UniProtKB/Swiss-Prot annotation:
Keyword Transmembrane assigned: no
Biological source species: Staphylococcus aureus
Protein name: Endonuclease MutS2
A Gene Ontology BP annotation from the UniProt entry: negative regulation of DNA recombination
Domain Smr: 644-719
Source lineage: Bacteria, Bacillati, Bacillota, Bacilli, Bacillales
Amino acid sequence: SLSGLSKVSAFIHRADIGGVLNVSELNLIKRLIQVQNQFKTFYNQLVEEDEGVKYPILDDKMNQLPVLTDLFQQINETCDTYDLYDNASYELQGIRSKISSTNQRIRQNLDRIVKSQANQKKLSDAIVTVRNERNVIPVKAEYRQDFNGIVHDQSASGQTLYIEPSSVVEMNNQISRLRHDEAIEKERILTQLTGYVAADKDALLVAEQVMGQLDFLIAKARYSRSIKGTKPIFKEERTVYLPKAYHPLLNRETVVANTIEFMEDIETVIITGPNTGGKTVTLKTLGLIIVMAQSGLLIPTLDGSQLSVFKNVYCDIGDEQSIEQSLSTFSSHMTNIVEILKNADKHSLVLFDELGAGTDPSEGAALAMSILDHVRKIGSLVMATTHYPELKAYSYNREGVMNASVEFDVDTLSPTYKLLMGVPGRSNAFDISKKLGLSLNIINKAKTMIGTDEKEINEMIESLERNYKRVETQRLELDRLVKEAEQVHDDLSKQYQQFQNYEKSLIEDAKEKANQKIKAATKEADDIIKDLRQLREQKGADVKEHELIDKKKRLDDHYEAKSIKQNVQKQKYDKIVAGDEVKVLSYGQKGEVLEIVNDEEAIVQMGIIKMKLPIEDLEKKQKEKVKPTKMVTRQNRQTIKTELDLRGYRYEDALIELDQYLDQAVLSNYEQVYIIHGKGTGALQKGVQQHLKKHKSVSDFRGGMPSEGGFGVTVATLK
């Protein structure tokens, strides 16, 4: 937790110019160091647990954090949250000890006075209290003359006097002197601590800056998690695609999310629809999400959002009238629009709410279209809301302009807040009037008063709305299926990676064990060869056979037929006879068989050495044989079936099996064969049919009839 962090740069600067920090200010500096150290520890543990994960930004921040352990210890050992410790210095401890003992003597003296039976009726209360930092007792005014001492205060009624008895005056004076000495010593200690702070001023300022940045990053992360935000993809080309976006200040559980998209070649979107239908909220949602994304925040949309970077976001939203300037609604809007048009460029996003409102409808609509034309020439991306019907036809007369609308539910007489991209808003006056009970005669007569073109336009818009809803439903289902498929793919990829890592670790372990065995065996072999050389040097060629056999036996003790070093199948032959050339497996050397001693042993000459060896340790050298020409014979028809079942085969194995089968079927003079691949996911069926399409022996193929196995079978016709 980063709670308790405060801005301390002002304290650090004051310490640097010779000021003295108090205990509270020192504790805020101590808290900064404490939080920094705790965060470092947490981050190091995080990195150790997630070895494969990299945090380059946080790594950079961690490397910037200074070491301030000494300063933390100095402050921590000197004071708590409220005051200096008694043992902050030897002098302070002595002063406070004297204050404590003197206070105790004063209390004892005053306790005797207030507990005296003779004084009970003279005191307002049998207690010791403090006035003006002096210990006093409450005496009734009429008994003032019975107590020798100094009056420090009296009650509001004047009935009680607070008197410091003369017996404790000197002790109270001593307390005052000690308090003065204590203040001087505390000032000295605080001055010393302030000097330590000044000495580490640069490091402290860096710590404050870095921890402030980390606090900001964590705040962004927590906010993004609270809105379940997603990371947008930024593109160089101008793009806005926000799937199921919603206003960040609205409750995600109840808000209606809408997909906001500027399709390719679309620069202007005009939203029409009923008042309070969500047009303005849509504008604000787009503007806020753009600013959030460019500020490094995750945004309230589904995964897959795409955005480009805008240099400026201009908006004219709401009726911000200026009372001082006495501007009307129209004038207020126009003032903002004029300023926007002065500064907007092709890298800007412009949002207009109720463009052209507040004046004559015909003039307002004409002005709105002219403004939109001007912004389009500038090249800005524009989203505007309006209730003017003239603007519905605007998009059909100009390239790069799209209509959109907010849906209205006639049955409930309320907006649904759903945004329909590509569908202009339509008038619902007749339907609403009918729902509210207006006479059909009146409604029908009203319909005759509007032109045929307008009727057709409304009917066209109604048809577009129905088609849009159907397509949107299908798209959402497709998005869901794609997301599920991606999740399955990710899960399988992770499992495959885990399997590969496990396989790699097994191989590495096996290699390590094999290397250890080979190393030990090699060392032993080197020792034996060394002994053999010494024997030869000592006795020349006159080496006793039993001496060689003894050395050979030491090698045999370390030889394993199934070791990793010789993990190959030995070749065995019917018989080894005298005169055969052989390979001695245990030595890896060639030799010639001189004599067969018995069924198990033979005498072999290897260079100048003659040895008796086990026959099973000998491998006969096979001479190269000329391979005979193979005759291709046609197999009997009855040995090849007219169907091939590939169910259960892996994809590559299935295609190999299919090739072999087709060759045999052609040799058997079959005209038609049945390939059974099953239904499954369809991958094997697709692979088989693509393979048949390219095969030189196949003239045609088709899917199986229901009686032949349906989609699980492909019937191939052979040439």
